[in-house]
Amino acid sequence: MDKIKVGLQYWIPQHALTRLVGKLASARAGSLTTAIIRWFIKQYNVNMDEALHSDPTHFKTFNEFFVRELKAGVRPIAEGEKVITHPADACVSQFGAIEYGKLIQAKGHTYSAQELLGGDAKLAEEFRDGDFATLYLSPRDYHRVHMPCDGTLRQMIYVPGDLFSVNPLTAENVPNLFARNERVVCIFDTEFGPMAQVLVGATIVGSIELVWAGTVTPPRGNTVYRWDYPANGNQAVVLKKGEEMGRFKLGSTVINLFAKQAIRFDDSMALGAPTRMGEPYAHQA
C-alpha cells in the first residue's frame, strides 16, 4: 500500500492540483469555509486554544486559518546570545553532520547540499562539513516560520521543482526529495557564520511567502532566480531571533544548514521529536 501511495505521486498532476487547492483555500465561501475549517480542526486535532482567534468563523478563507497567528506569549523565545531556537512548530525529520557534501534525507537516502542550494557549488562550500536539521510541519502545526537566531539576509534563491508530498513516507521512498521539490533558499549572515533557512514546497502547498518579499511562489516556472541583498542601508533585511520570516499556505518542511564547527545540537534533539518554535535546538560552538 505504501508503494502505491508513493507511486501515485509520480502520476498525479502535482502543479495543477496545487494550483487548484491554492485557489480553493483562498476562496471566500462563507459557511462552507467555516465548515471545512471545523472539520480540519477536528480531523487533525488542531490546538485552537493557542490561536489569537480561536473561533473558526473569524477566518474568511481557509488560508487565513492555516496561517493563524498565535496568542502573545505562547511561544516564548529562549534567551541567550548563543542559543539557537527552533524556527517552527514541527517534528525533527533528520539532523546531523553534512558529510562529503551530503545530507541525510531518510535511512538509506542522502542528497547533496549543492543541489539543495540551487546548484551553487561556491555557496555549498560554505557549509562543507557543517551541520543540518530538517523539520517537518504536519497539517496540525502552526505554519509561520521564524528566525532561529539574529541574521542579515545576504541572498534569496527560488528553485523550481516537483511538488511531491514531504511526509515521512515520501522522504523514505523518493530519492533526492528535498533537492527536487520546489523551494526558497534564504542565506543569512550571523555572528557564527552563514546560515541557510530553506523552505521546501510540496503537493498542495499553495504558496510560500516571506516577510520582506511577499509571495515568492506562485507563480511557478522553470528558472532558478537569485536576489542579492545589501548588509546595510534601507534595502537591508535584518531579523532578530524569534521574528517571523515566512509562512507556508499549506505546510511543508524547513531545512537549516550551518557552517563547520559553528554549532552543537541541544541534548533535546532526537529523530521524530516534536519541536516548538522558540525552544532551544542548538548552541553556538
Curated annotation (Swiss-Prot):
The EC designation for this entry is 4.1.1.65
Chief location: membrane
Membrane-topology annotation of the record: Peripheral membrane protein
Quote the catalytic residue positions: 89 (charge relay system), 146 (charge relay system), 252 (charge relay system), 252 (schiff-base intermediate with substrate)
Where Pyruvic acid (Ser) occurs, the residues are 252
Q: Which InterPro entries match?
A: PS_Dcarbxylase, PSD-B, PSD_type1_pro
MF terms (GO), sorted A to Z: phosphatidylserine decarboxylase activity
Location relative to the cell: Cell membrane
Any single GO CC term annotated in Swiss-Prot or TrEMBL for this entry:
plasma membrane
Keyword Lipid biosynthesis (UniProt): yes
- Spell out the Pfam families in the cross-references: PS_Dcarbxylase
The GO annotation for biological process reads: phosphatidylethanolamine biosynthetic process
Cofactor: bound how, per the entry note? Binds 1 pyruvoyl group covalently per subunit.
Catalysed transformations (reactions): a 1,2-diacyl-sn-glycero-3-phospho-L-serine + H(+) = a 1,2-diacyl-sn-glycero-3-phosphoethanolamine + CO2
Which residues does the annotation list for site: Cleavage (non-hydrolytic)?
251-252
Cofactors needed by this protein, per the record, are: pyruvate
Q: Which UniProt keywords apply?
A: Cell membrane, Decarboxylase, Lipid biosynthesis, Lipid metabolism, Lyase, Membrane, Phospholipid biosynthesis, Phospholipid metabolism, Pyruvate, Zymogen
Q: In which pathway does it act?
A: Phospholipid metabolism; phosphatidylethanolamine biosynthesis; phosphatidylethanolamine from CDP-diacylglycerol: step 2/2
UniProt modification remark? Is synthesized initially as an inactive proenzyme. Formation of the active enzyme involves a self-maturation process in which the active site pyruvoyl group is generated from an internal serine residue via an autocatalytic post-translational modification. Two non-identical subunits are generated from the proenzyme in this reaction, and the pyruvate is formed at the N-terminus of the alpha chain, which is derived from the carboxyl end of the proenzyme.
| Purpose of the protein | Catalyzes the formation of phosphatidylethanolamine (PtdEtn) from phosphatidylserine (PtdSer).
Membership in a protein family: Belongs to the phosphatidylserine decarboxylase family. PSD-B subfamily. Prokaryotic type I sub-subfamily.
Q: Could you describe the subunit structure of this protein? A: Heterodimer of a large membrane-associated beta subunit and a small pyruvoyl-containing alpha subunit.
Q: What is this protein called?
A: Phosphatidylserine decarboxylase proenzyme
Record organism: Vibrio cholerae serotype O1 (strain ATCC 39315 / El Tor Inaba N16961)
